[in-house]
Design a protein with these regions (language model features):
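Helix-to-beta-strand junctions that scaffold the AdoMet/dcAdoMet cofactor pocket
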Residues: 78, 125, 151-153
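Mobile active-site "lid"/loop adjacent to the S-adenosyl-L-methionine
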Residues: 108-139
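Residue-level signal for the nucleotide or nucleotide-sugar donor/cofactor binding architecture
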Residues: 10-14, 64, 68, 125, ...
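Conserved Class I SAM-dependent methyltransferase catalytic core
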Residues: 134-195
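Conserved beta/loop motifs at nucleotide-recognition and modification sites
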Residues: 1-2, 8-11
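Short loop/edge segments at beta-strand edges and connector loops
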Residues: 5, 86-87, 161, 184
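Conserved SAM/SAH cofactor-binding pocket of Class I
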Residues: 11, 17-114, 118
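Generic structural signal for residues in well-ordered beta-strands
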Residues: 3, 82-84, 180
Length: 196
């Protein structure tokens, strides 16, 4: 699948395929999916493309990113099963009208604030989609405790994680009463955390 991107969205990377594959392994054919921080819509739309009975909601704080995601959904013929909503998980009450989901996908910001990034990434991708505090964990700390309000009983959340973050994000999940399992990417690095 090809996705349009703009400076308002992250460029989809091959590593994120680990998230989609884990989602396909974990979710039913008719799953209701929430994609948090949808950006270009790549995770949600790739999942819906592979699961014709599924439907989903992509949220993002950026209206410009949501316009890109919506256009990608239209272009890929998935617009009837994908809804895009402006919401910021750092604001109280953001989830009230969304309902519950079988599957939550999330590639949150997870880069440490002072990280040295490739100039192409730092200059051309939105900082709000990259940086998450001094340890890169701020967004996980905000999202994971809210999963109980988002998931149906037996639901699953799948997070993309950065290098060296599996143990820390797993501990955040454990503190909130969830079990976590790591999935490795094609380079054999921990890339996804499956939270139940």
């Amino acid at each position: 699948l090809e996705f349009a991107v703009t400076p308002d969205t992250l460029i989809p990377r091959g590593d994120s395929e680990t998230i989609v594959q884990a989602a396909l392994d974990c979710a039913a054919q008719d799953a209701r999916v929430l994609d948090m921080g949808t950006g270009s819509g790549a995770l949600l739309l790739a999942f819906l493309h592979e699961r014709p009975g599924a439907r989903g909601v992509g949220i993002d704080a950026s209206a410009a990113a949501l316009a890109v995601a919506s256009a990608n959904g239209q272009r890929l013929g998935l617009a009837k099963r994908a809804q895009f909503v402006q919401a910021n998980w750092l604001e109280a009450g953001w989830e009230h009208d969304l309902g519950r989901f079988d599957l939550v996908l999330c590639n949150p910001p997870y880069v440490e604030s002072d990280a040295n990034l490739d100039p192409d990434v730092r200059e051309f991708e939105p900082a709000t989609a990259l940086f998450a505090g001094p340890e890169g964990l701020d967004d996980y700390r905000a999202i994971v405790p809210q999963l109980g309000k988002l998931l149906v009983p037996g639901g699953v959340a799948i997070f993309e994680i950065g290098a060296g973050q599996a143990e820390a994000v797993g501990a955040i999940a454990s503190e909130s009463g969830f079990a976590a399992e790591t999935r490795r990417d094609l380079a054999d690095r921990p890339r996804a955390l499956i939270v139940r």
